[in-house]
């Protein structure tokens, strides 16, 4: 079975949104990475995400599929 990889661009404004995003990511049993300026951060790491420049768009790569997490991605997606 081929693992599906999808990506999405999100914007997280502040600590509360980061916490909500990480909580949703942590419920997934597959890897989720955030790419930003050639840096790769684990989407399940709240400190890792908070160390990034949250004024920038962040590219999220999901190595699996979760309808619940997709809703979170849609909520924070950059149009």
Q: Which residues fall in each region the model found?
A:
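Short, Lys/Arg-enriched N-terminal segments with co-localized hydrophobic residues
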Residues: 1-4
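Well-ordered beta-strand positions in beta-sheet-rich domains
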Residues: 7-9, 40
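N-terminal intrinsically disordered, cationic/polar leader segments
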Residues: 8, 23-28, 61
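Short, surface-exposed ligand-recognition loops at beta-strand->loop->(often short) alpha-helix junctions
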Residues: 11-16
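Hydrophobic side chains in well-ordered alpha-helices
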Residues: 20-24, 69-72
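Conserved short beta-strand edge segments in small beta-sheet-based binding/regulatory domains
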Residues: 32-37, 75-79
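Amphipathic, hydrophobic secondary-structure cores in small proteins
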Residues: 33-55
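C-terminal structural segments of small proteins and small subunits
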Residues: 50-79
